[in-house]
Each structure stands twice: as structure tokens, then as C-alpha cells.
Swiss-Prot record:
Subcellular location: Cytoplasm
Name the UniProt record assigns to this protein: Putative gluconeogenesis factor
Main location (coarse class): cytoplasm
Originating species: Lactococcus lactis subsp. lactis (strain IL1403) (Streptococcus lactis)
Keywords per UniProt: Cytoplasm
GO function term, MF aspect, one: LPPG:FO 2-phospho-L-lactate transferase activity
Gene, per the UniProt record: yjiF
SUPFAM superfamilies cross-referenced by the UniProt entry: CofD-like
GO biological process: regulation of cell shape
Protein family membership: Belongs to the gluconeogenesis factor family.
């Protein structure tokens, strides 16, 4: 019997935690990673070199590799603010940019680097071109650029993408749709709802594949609400927004953390984008027609509240070995 095929879709700092745990399991693992980041080092590189932003891809490469910690630390090394043009760039971002330019494609660069770093699984950027994220707010205002969305401080109605260079509709990378169609289980998140997960899903080919796939679709619900994105959101609100963007109720299962976050770990000075713990609304979740798995998925570290990758991975593997939740 072949290993279950698990596809994880997202970006940011959320999915690397889960991918690092999943790569140790007996599964066929694939990561599909957002390329809509336009802030910080990634934003500067995509403007200078005209490639898909490397930051989220760098974190996923490291999470899925068996490289020693010292090698990972080298890739994560961020140049000091006194280092002129290099200031703020992680070395790994510059390496991805260089290989992307050499090979004329971020997709090809990631495949090369995945071999080089002994990645266990497959990594695909959701698109091979840099994308611009558009957020349309409830008041009709529209904000362009992932890094600018939270600062508007309005209620987001929906998001969509365009290719940064041409303004055209985005196109999925090679093998992305195939991976979704052949998957046994698809995992969305964890991560920022509007700026890490949805920038993959609203690529038309990916959205259509999520409609058509026979895979079980699992959403790992965020533990904390996020400033400028999901303020006052319940767990059901997160699921509802995902289903609305896809166009139908495709989420089969949601993983919900029920462990309380201690007050002292809601550190808005250190983690200023996170606000309070996500409220539970089990009646509304029932209306979204999802199977709810409630458990302690909480890990307290670095002064903040995060997902415990091992606990999440355990549930994902268990779901992948069952058939009853296939939609």
C-alpha cells in the first residue's frame, strides 16, 4: 500500500512548523507556497530581480530538509542593518534569487535547491511569477500589496491576485494542479488567512482544482486573531471566508485548538500583529458542514502562542488514513 499523499498549502511562518513535523511521517508530502509577499527582504528582491518572492519558499525549504541546524542558521542569517544594500536580507533569500536568475525560473530554482538541500518531499511555488495581492474592503476601498493590507484597518470583503509585471490573471505553477488532484489530503494553513492561505487559493486553476479534487480538505484554524485581517473572527468565520472564496463548501475538517492561551503570552508588544485568542462557534461551524476536531494544538514559546507541529501532524496523518470525511 502506497503512502498517503498530503498537500499543504500556505505561506508565512505557519506551515513550516507543520511541514517540519510531517516530513518525519510515512506520507508523500508536497508544499504549495504563496508568492504574493511584497514586504521586507522578499519585496526588495522581487522589485530588483523580477522574480517570485523567496522568503516563504526559504522557510519551507529549511523545514522540509534534513540539513543540520548550523546549515539552516546560515540560510536564515540576516545581514545587519549597518550592512548597506545587504541590510535585512537573509542569505537564503539571496541564494534563491541567484539560482532563479541563473535558471530563469523560481520554480526550477526551488527544484534544484530542494535536491541540493535533501528535501524530503516536493515544494512548488503556487505561481512562477511575482503576484500582487488586492484586498477589497467592505466599504469598497481597495488596497494593493500584501504588506499594506493590515494597515488599512478595515473589514476585508475578499481578495484577488494579479501578475505584478503584466496585471494579468495569475497562472499556477507546473505540477501544482496535478498535486491537488492526486492528493489524498489537502491541508490549508496554519497561517494568515487573507495574506498567506488565500493568495494560493484565489489563483483560478487552484480554486478549480479544490472544487474538483476527491481529496479530503483540512483547515488548521489559527489560534489568534490578526490585526487588520481577522479581528473579532471566530473559528467558523475563518472557515466561512475560505469557503466563500472557493465558491462552495469544500472544507471537510477543521482542526481547532481548545487550549487556553495564558494572558502573559498575548504579547502585543513583541507580536504586534496578533490580538486575542480566536473564539469558538461550534453552531456556526456545523452550518459550514465541517467535521470539527478539537484538541490541544497549542505550543507556548518565544513569548507567543503557536501551533504544536507534532500534534497537528498527528491529526493530519490520522485523517489521511481514514476515508469517511472525503467530500
Amino acid at each position: 500500500m502506497s503512502n498517503p499523499k498530503v498537500v499543504v498549502i500556505g505561506g508565512g511562518t505557519g506551515i513550516p512548523v507543520v511541514l517540519k513535523a510531517l516530513r518525519k511521517e510515512k506520507i508523500d508530502l508536497t508544499a504549495i507556497v504563496t508568492v504574493a509577499d511584497d514586504g521586507g527582504s522578499s519585496g526588495r528582491i522581487r522589485s530588483a530581480v523580477n522574480i517570485a518572492p523567496p522568503g516563504d519558499l526559504r522557510n519551507v525549504l529549511i523545514a522540509m530538509s534534513d540539513m543540520p541546524k548550523f546549515y539552516a542558521d546560515i540560510l536564515q542569517y540576516r545581514f545587519d542593518k549597518s550592512d548597506g544594500e545587504l541590510a535585512g536580507h537573509p542569505l537564503g533569500n539571496l541564494i534563491i534569487a541567484a539560482v532563479s536568475e541563473m535558471q530563469g525560473s523560481t520554480y526550477r530554482a526551488i527544484q534544484t535547491l530542494a535536491q541540493f538541500f535533501h528535501v524530503e518531499g516536493k515544494i512548488y511555488p503556487s505561481s512562477d511569477a511575482a503576484l500582487t495581492l488586492h484586498a477589497v474592503f467592505k466599504d469598497g476601498h481597495e488596497v494593493l500589496g500584501e504588506s499594506h493590507i493590515a494597515s488599512y484597518k478595515g473589514l476585508i470583503d475578499h481578495v484577488y491576485l494579479t501578475q505584478t509585471a503584466s496585471g494579468d490573471s495569475p497562472v499556477a505553477s507546473k505540477n501544482v494542479v496535478k498535486s491537488i488532484m492526486e492528493a489524498d489530503t489537502i491541508v490549508l494553513g496554519p497561517g494568515s488567512l487573507f495574506t498567506s492561505i488565500l493568495p494560493n487559493i484565489v489563483i483560478p486553476e487552484i480554486c478549480e482544482a479544490l472544487w474538483k479534487t476527491s481529496a479530503k480538505i483540512v483547515y488548521v484554524c489559527n489560534i489568534m486573531t490578526q490585526r487588520g485581517e481577522t479581528e473579532h473572527f471566530s473559528d467558523a468565520d475563518h472557515v466561512r471566508v475560505l469557503n466563500e472564496h472557493i465558491g462552495t463548501k469544500v472544507i471537510d475538517t477543521v482542526l481547532v485548538n481548545i487550549q487556553e492561551v495564558p494572558e502573559e503570552y498575548m504579547n502585543t508588544n513583541k507580536f504586534d500583529e496578533y490580538l486575542v485568542q480566536v473564539d469558538h462557534d461550534f453552531e456556526a461551524l456545523k452550518a459550514e458542514e465541517v467535521n470539527v476536531i478539537s484538541n490541544n494544538f497549542l505550543e507556548l514559546r518565544d513569548g507567543g502562542a503557536f501551533h504544536n507541529g507534532e500534534a497537528v501532524a498527528k491529526e493530519i496523518v490520522a485523517i489521511s488514513q481514514r476515508q469517511e470525511f472525503r467530500h
